Amino acid sequence: MRIKVDEKSDALYIRLDESPIVESEEIQPGIILDYNDKNQAVGIEILGIKKRIPLEELKKLQFETI
């Protein structure tokens, strides 16, 4: 899994899987899911991230491997 914050685009992208993306669907305004050819979600894009989560809070994210 990879997480990318693009400050210029004001977007957060979470890549769950490296399989090719064949379809994308906006499930809510500004939230887009990417799917592979097996209809599995492989990516999540959140637009307008600065309005949803303050940038300073994003920088504090902690990750846990389970």
Feature annotation, model-predicted:
Residues 1-4, 44-46:
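Short low-complexity stretches enriched in small and charged residues
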Residues 2-3, 7, 12-26:
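Structured beta-strand/loop patches that form or line metal/cofactor-binding pockets in enzymes
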